[in-house]
Swiss-Prot record:
Complex formation: Homodimer.
Chain residues that bind ATP: 92, 121, 149-151, 162-169, 377-379
Domain Toprim residues, every copy: 456-573
Keywords on record: ATP-binding, Biological rhythms, Cytoplasm, DNA-binding, Isomerase, Magnesium, Metal-binding, Nucleotide-binding, Nucleus, Topoisomerase
Site feature location: Interaction with DNA: 490, 493, 662-663, 724, 758, 764, 932
Protein name per UniProt: DNA topoisomerase 2-alpha
InterPro entries given in the database record: DNA_Topoisomerase_II, DTHCT, HATPase_C_sf, Ribosomal_Su5_D2-typ_SF, Ribsml_uS5_D2-typ_fold_subgr, Topo_IIA, Topo_IIA-like_dom_sf, Topo_IIA_A/C_ab
Annotated Mg(2+) 2 binding sites: 542, 544
Length: 1553
């Protein structure tokens, strides 16, 4: 019983019939049913979807081939499993092409009536031979037994479609009858066998002898019942037919027959055409196909898709209908290139992402891939990673160019516009609301959005303060019809703004919301205007140029989006007075400066009126606001549309495409203004008393043009002094303050704003001050202010400067030598708010625009000028003074140790320094100019160390040894990588070369006209002509002033002598009688005072009351009668007579000097001080390193010095490094030529060309070792060469320049010595300055006559001097006599000439000398070599260079030192007594400046005294003995040395306005 009860699964059922069915028995049976084992054949039939896909019918869109239509995409109902088994047989046939290239034909026959399909192919058949292991013939094995294949060897790289060993067997299994016939010539047998019943029964195999061509034919009858079908319907036949076409297109050189007809497909390209017939793009043109057969394994076609991303692709003849990684691999390459093009063309539109670009592509890919993998047996999606493809598909430039032009880009751009419009429309409300929320600071009109909204006006104000003014005025006109909204600063230029900017711009969105505007709505009639919340916009801005710009931007905003609104006079402006004059209770407002000037010239006693300037709307009071709104007719000016010329004017002002037209517009304006000045005509102005409306054309051409011009004036410097207005204001203030002590940057900024009437933010002013004082490499070559504190370094390009609250500055000792105080008297000073401010331009003794360079972007023009060497420039001026042509100049940056080579006209390549230490280490010791250390580290070395997604790591490590002034990276890399990098060019690989293009040398000339210069020589020549003329004016002024002082001393001496002799008795006599006596005896009224009054009559008339003026015109003998009694003593009498004689002699000496002599004296004094300053800088830099050991408690000096030497070695270049010479190749020069041509074409761009990326290196095959050997030979061979080399070989000093001063001073000035071009003669430059009708000329001609009159002692000519005030008066009273002794001058000039000659004779690049000493050329040459050797000669060791630096220059420097003390003495602070003082006495113009109260002061009076005298701006006495006060100050503060600084990089503050 136990046995009967126990579960016995093997017991027959009839053996225990009486056994009751219990729950346990049910469970037993379910276990058997649940857990079953099937054979593989059963499994395939039971679960077909695992192997062949679904056996249920599906309906989806597919490409099919219909007899009547051809290839088309339509909804198809088919069974994927049936489609797949057919496809397996077809792909097997195509695979045979990869095994046998001679295969040429495939025949596909589909017989729906008989439910029979056959695929026949020629080419090598299946081996008809018995398999020795399986003991069965191979065809029977691979077609009739599962898990058999020839594709299982993954070590064998195959490009066939078969992969898993299922394909043909699956077709056999799902067929009622499956026949294989194959003929094998090799085995001379024909094999044939048939399987039936889903491969359940194998028929008898037949073998026959065969001697023909190989072939294989598979014929099968699908088991339609397994697919729930009864016949092969139209859809499945159409799908199979398309696969036949696929094979014809994807298999090369194979004819495909379908049902006996050959398919008309001759390759992949013609196959693609089947898809595109009758397809057109958006414009109705046939789609353009770009085709490329990349290599034997890849063929790609591309065209435009109008319904998302489409792809037709094949992997080894398999149709990958879902794509895969092979499609992504190709598509991503195309997308990357297209997206760059789209971004360029769509800078301002909606951001475009890669998938959005892809959505416009239709791509066709035919590929052969080794051992491909798929995500399923259905093989619709290829999953193999690209790195395993076994081949690459790099699309050519030609293909990419075609892709850009085939319509895809245009389609994307159209889509972008559509999307942008859609997004913008979401910002607008289509319904008019009476109340709106979420707009802060809006004071809405009560009727806005109501039925009366068309009568409402929205007042847009410039800032909150202006809103307050408008709200005050609303008290008069009421709030029902007027709303107010303040704008924050300037509006966006929507014409050129990006879509993102417009979408995110709160100002624009708020205005649209407040007014109720809708994008793309056409406001053609009055009805459409009623849909708006406001019927008008009134613009209320300051009456300055920035206010005009805001008005223009608002007009542009409306015109760009809703041009029809302008025709409805939708816009108005509210004007307020710029100036009000009042007298008693009468008040006159003026709405423009020219109108005020007209009134002034026509009103005799205008001085008696109170004049008030209104700088902005904030100046007006609430009471005045109410007055403005009460007289709405006068203050409300409507904009009136006058026709197409208005549209053209607005577009001209704001469109990016109108750059050239804008240049012409501004040029015409400048010329018109100049002509008006020349002819004394008033400026044109808009707002007269009767002005009620304004056309847009008038607004643009008469008001907005003033802003555009002022934008240029603020952004582009003057040729004369190289300064922008903000910088000039800083300099003016520093000259006027004449600080003896350093001053905080923030305090100086406040002082500038006060003294020079600066109207912009002080933050930008502080940046200007910082920029003027910076002296790191790549900034200024000559900083006009001293950087006392952290003003920025080359580590961050100056961005690491400390807050202006913490840093100090003061004038550089060189500033007043560059801008001599005596020249201030002949400059034309400007007036702002009736306050005398800075001059139109200063007049330096050298062109500062070349020394410190310039950079700025204005309206229509941009400016970019590199820095040039100070001494080269000085020598060129001396050449011009001697009647010679200036030598060509290369850009030069102070303390830059790299090289600058010329590639073409105004095209240069700047190279850093790199040397090789050993086979795995290089050392970078200089970066290209304006490549900042930190930026280089982050953007170049870090990616090289860590690698990026696209590039593997190149270096293994780097170490940093920089200081704030030097660069040193020691970089480690593998030997192989270093060899590769060296072959390409280390400068190229490590991005140590940048291009400098100077095709935008645009400057304001001396008459305020923008002019483009072709070369630095052109700038130099124009400056030279003007400066020489101003030396003539200076001489005339000095002759007049000295004549007056001489007359005064003569009168004083005669008066004393006559008093002593008793000829004049003054005791106990009335003053009137004394004056009468003096007049009778021929004494003049105070000559100095009279001369000054003559010079300043116009200014005095403006500043003083009528009564004071009258008093000043009477005779003044106080200069005689106020002399102290002790002047009657013998000593004082003799001293006075001596002063008189000295003054006469000084005057005579001056008369004998030519303007050229005066200039040469100034240059000599400047160069002497420059030497002293640079020597001091060098000394400070070396302090603590090579100089005195630092004091440490308990430390020994010796030990300390060792430490400092170690420190020095650490930051200095390694002595063992082999310098790598920068390559300047023909390829780089060709690139430069291309850039020039491109520049000519693209001159329409507003912004100037920026420094371009790294240049490519040459393709020299030689290794470093070979190249160095060749280089050494070449250098030795060319050492004496006297002809100009044609290929830049290495780093050297400036070529024609052998400057004595630079020698003594050091390695700072390294300039490539070889010039590849012959001296360029500047095309005869226009010299408008000589006979120009500018204001300056008119002024100077007046001065000439005046000087002559004064020199003769005439004092009656006050009335003739109307035009003199601005120029005649000098801020400082004392003229700085800076002429050095006669001795140094001859020294300097001839030696320079000799040096130029000497060096031009040996202009060979290999010549070591950097420059030639002032005294003896021969001994100095070796010293100079210190620099050159590093750069050029046989790669000497750094140690040699260092010893040369230390030893060789020492002696010459000492010799120089003996001459230089006088220059130090001239620095007014007289800290060092002794020898320096001797120099002072020999200054060229010695005279003590006499004032009314101190006529007997001695010539030798201390500098401090003289300086204090200059502090008084109204004191006009001139002490020609005194050294420049500015020069003096530095002597007290010797610590700060100047380095090249330029305000270019961070651009002057003016650019920020």
């Amino acid at each position: 019983m136990e046995l009967l009860d126990s579960p016995a699964p093997l017991r027959p059922l009839h053996d225990n019939p009486r056994l009751p069915k219990a729950d346990g028995a049910q469970k037993r049976l379910s276990v058997e049913r649940i857990y079953q084992k099937k054979t593989q054949l059963e499994h395939i039939l039971l679960r077909p979807d695992t192997y062949i896909g679904s056996v249920e019918t599906v309906t989806q869109q597919m490409w099919v081939f219909d007899e009547d239509v051809g290839l088309n995409c339509r909804d198809v109902t088919f069974v994927p499993g049936l489609y797949k088994i057919f496809d397996e047989i077809l792909v097997n046939a195509a695979d045979n092409k990869q095994r046998d290239k001679s295969m040429s034909c495939i025949k596909v026959t589909i017989d729906p009536e008989n439910n029979t399909i056959s695929v026949w192919n020629n080419g090598k058949g299946i081996p008809v031979v018995e398999h020795k292991v399986e003991k069965v013939y191979v065809p029977a094995l691979i077609f009739g037994q599962l898990l058999t294949s020839s594709n299982y060897d993954d070590d064998e790289k195959k490009v066939t479609g078969g992969r898993n060993g299922y394909g043909a067997k699956l077709c056999n299994i799902f067929s009622t009858k499956f026949t294989v016939e194959t003929a094998c010539r090799e085995y001379k047998k024909l094999f044939k066998q048939t399987w039936t019943d889903n491969m359940g029964k194998a028929g008898e195999m037949t073998l026959k002898h065969f001697d023909g061509e190989d072939y294989t034919c598979v014929t099968f009858q699908p088991d339609l019942s397994k697919f729930k079908m009864t016949i092969l319907d139209k859809d499945i036949v159409a799908l199979m037919s398309r696969r036949a076409y696929d094979i014809a297109g994807s298999t090369k050189d194979v004819k495909v027959f379908l049902n006996g007809k050959r398919l008309p497909v001759k390759g992949f390209r013609s196959y693609v055409d089947l898809y595109l017939k009758d397809k057109v793009d958006e414009t109705g043109n046939a789609l353009k196909v770009i085709h490329e057969e990349v290599n034997s394994r890849w063929e790609v076609c591309l065209t435009l898709s109008e319904k998302g991303f489409q792809q037709v692709s094949f992997v080894n003849s398999i149709a990958t209908t879902k794509g895969g990684r092979h499609v992504d691999y190709v598509a991503d390459q195309i997308v990357t290139k297209l997206i760059d093009v789209v971004k360029k063309k769509n800078k301002n539109g909606v951001g475009v992402k890669p998938f959005q670009v892809k959505n416009h592509m239709w791509i066709f890919v035919n590929s052969l891939i080794e051992n491909p993998t798929f995500d399923s047996q259905t093989k619709e999606n290829m999953t193999l990673q690209a790195k395993s493809f076994g081949s690459t598909c790099k699309l050519s430039e030609k293909f990419i160019k075609g892709a850009v032009g085939c319509g895809i880009v245009e389609s994307i751009l159209n889509w972008v516009k559509f999307k942008a419009q859609t997004q913008l429309n979401k910002k607008c409300s289509a319904v008019k609301h009476t109340k709106i929320k979420g707009v802060p600071k809006l004071d809405d009109a009560n009727d806005a959005g109501s039925k009366n909204s068309i009568d409402c006006t929205l007042i847009l104000t410039e800032g909150d303060s202006a809103k307050t003014l408008a709200v005050s005025g609303l008290g008069v006109v009421g709030r029902d019809k007027y709303g107010v909204f303040p704008l924050r600063g300037k509006m966006l230029n929507v014409r050129e703004a990006s879509h993102k900017q417009i979408m995110e711009n709160a100002e624009i969105n708020n205005i649209i919301k407040i007014v109720g505007l809708q994008y793309k709505k056409n406001y053609e009639d009055r009805e459409s205007l009623k849909s708006l919340r406001y019927g008008k916009i009134m613009i209320m801005t300051d009456q300055d140029q920035d206010g005009s710009h805001i008005k223009g931007l608002l007009i542009n905003f409306i015109h760009h989006n809703w041009p029809s609104l302008l025709r409805h006079n939708f816009l108005e402006e509210f004007i307020t007075p710029i100036i009000k004059v009042s007298k008693n209770k009468e008040e006159i407002p003026f709405y423009s400066i020219p109108e005020f000037e007209e009134w002034k010239s026509s009103t005799q006693n205008y001085n008696s009126w109170k004049i008030k300037y209104y700088k902005g709307l904030g100046t007006s009071t609430s009471k005045e606001a109410k007055e403005y709104f009460a007289d709405m007719a006068r203050h409300r000016i409507g904009f009136k549309y006058s026709g197409p010329e208005d549209d053209a004017a607005i577009t001209l002002a704001f469109s990016k495409k109108k750059v050239e037209e804008r240049k012409e517009w501004l040029t015409n304006f400048m010329e018109d203004r100049r002509q008006r000045n020349v002819h004394g005509l008033p400026e044109d102005y808009l707002y007269g008393k009767d002005t009620n409306y304004l056309t847009y054309n008038d607004f643009i051409n008469k008001e907005l043009v003033l802003f555009s011009n002022s934008d240029n004036e603020r952004s582009i410097p003057s040729l004369v002094d190289g300064l922008k207005p903000g910088q000039r204001k800083v300099l003016f203030t520093c000259f006027k303050r004449n600080d003896k002590r350093e001053v905080k940057g923030a305090q100086l900024a406040g002082s500038v704003a006060e003294m020079s009437s600066y109207h912009h933010g002080e933050a930008s002013l502080m940046m200007t001050i910082i920029n003027l004082a910076q002296n790191f490499v790549g900034s200024n070559n000559l900083n006009l202010l001293q950087p006392i504190g952290q003003f920025g370094t080359r580590l961050h390009g100056g961005k690491d400067s400390a807050s202006p609250r913490y840093i100090f500055t003061m004038l550089s000792p060189l500033a007043r030598l560059l801008f001599p105080p005596v020249d201030d008297n002949v400059l034309r000073f400007l007036y702002d708010d009736n306050q005398r401010v800075e001059p139109e331009w200063y007049m330096p003794i050298i062109p500062m625009v070349l020394i410190n360079g310039a950079e700025g972007i204005g309206t229509g023009w941009s400016c970019k000028i590199p820095n040039f060497d100070i001494r080269e420039t000085v020598n060129n001026i001396r050449c011009l003074l001697d009647g010679k042509e200036p030598l060509p100049m290369l850009p030069s940056y102070k303390n830059f140790k790299g090289t600058i080579d010329e590639l073409g006209p105004n095209q240069y390549v700047i190279s850093g320094e790199v040397s090789i230490l050993d086979s795995t280490t290089i050392e970078i010791t200089e970066l290209p100019v304006r490549t900042w250390t930190q930026t280089y580290k982050e953007q170049v070395l870090e990616p090289m160390l860590n690698g990026t997604e696209k590039t593997p790591p190149l270096i293994t490590d780097y170490k940093e040894y920089h200081t704030d002034t030097t660069v040193k990276f020691v970089v480690k890399m593998s030997e192989e990588k270093l060899a590769e990098a060296e072959a390409v060019g280390l400068h190229k690989v490590f991005k140590l070369q940048t291009n400098l293009t100077c095709n935008s040398m645009v400057l304001f000339d001396h008459v305020g006209f923008l002019k483009k210069y072709e070369s630095p020589q052109d700038i130099l020549k124009e400056f030279f002509e003007l400066r020489l003329r101003y030396y003539g004016l200076r001489k005339e002024w000095l002759i007049g002033m000295l004549g007056a002082e001489s007359a005064k001393l003569n009168n004083q001496a005669r008066f004393i002598l006559e008093k002593i002799d008793g000829k004049i008795v003054i005791e106990n006599k009335p003053k009137k009688e004394l004056i009468q006596v003096l007049i009778q005896r021929g004494y003049e009224s105070d000559p100095v005072k009279a001369w000054k009054e003559l010079q300043n009559k116009e200014e005095e008339e403006g500043d003083e009351s009528g009564e004071e003026s009258a008093a000043a015109t009477g005779p003044d003998f106080n200069y005689l009668l106020n002399m102290p009694l002790w002047y009657l003593t013998k000593e004082k009498k003799d001293e006075l007579c001596k002063q008189r004689d000295n003054k006469d002699k000084e005057l005579e000496d001056l008369k004998h000097k030519s303007p050229s002599d005066l200039w040469k004296e100034d240059l000599a004094a400047f160069v002497e001080e420059l030497d002293a300053v640079e020597a001091k800088q060098m000394q400070d830099e070396m302090a603590g390193i090579t100089g005195k050991p630092l004091k440490v408690k308990g430390g020994k000096q010796g030990g300390k010095q060792k430490v400092t030497k170690a420190q020095l070695a650490e930051v200095m270049p390694s002595p063992h490094g082999i310098r790598v010479v920068p390559r300047v190749t023909a390829e780089m020069k060709a690139e430069a030529e291309k850039r020039i041509k491109k520049k000519i074409k693209s001159e329409k761009n507003e912004s100037d060309e920026k420094q371009e990326g790294n240049s490519s290196g040459d393709k020299e095959p030689s290794s470093l070792k070979q190249r160095l050997a060749q280089k050494r030979k070449a250098e030795q061979g060319t050492k004496r060469q006297t002809t100009l080399p044609f290929k830049p070989i290495k780093k050297m000093k400036r070529n024609p320049w052998s400057d004595s001063e630079s020698d003594s001073e050091s390695d700072d000035f390294e300039v490539p010595s070889k010039r590849e071009r012959v001296v360029r003669q500047a095309a005869a430059k226009i010299k408008p300055m000589v006979n120009s009708d500018s204001d300056a000329d008119l002024t100077s001609s007046d001065e000439d006559s005046e000087y002559q009159e004064n020199s003769e002692g005439n004092t009656d000519s006050d009335t003739t001097s109307k035009k003199k005030p601005p120029k005649a008066k000098a801020v400082p009273k004392e003229k700085k006599g800076k002429a050095p002794k006669e001795k140094p001058l001859p020294d300097a000039v001839p030696v320079r000439v000799q040096n130029v000659a000497a060096e031009s004779a040996s202009q060979d690049p290999a010549a070591p000398p950097v420059s030639v000493p002032r005294a003896q050329a021969v001994p100095k040459k070796p010293a100079a070599a210190k620099k050159g050797s590093t750069a050029k000669d046989n790669q000497p060791s750094i140690m040699d260079i260092l010893t040369k630096k230390k030893a060789a220059p020492k002696a010459p420097r000492r010799a120089q030192r003996e001459e230089s003390p006088p220059s130090e003495a001239t620095a007014a602070v007289a800290k060092k007594p002794g020898p320096p003082r001797g120099r002072k006495a020999t200054k060229r113009l010695t005279s003590s400046s006499d004032s009314d109260s101190d006529f007997g002061s001695r010539p030798s009076k201390s500098v401090a005294a003289k300086k204090s005298k200059r502090d008084d701006d109204d004191s006009y006495s001139i002490d020609l003995t005194a050294d420049s006060p500015a020069a003096a100050a530095p002597r007290t503060r010797p610590g700060r040395l100047k380095k090249p600084v330029q305000y270019l990089e961070s651009s002057d503050e003016d650019d920020m306005f």
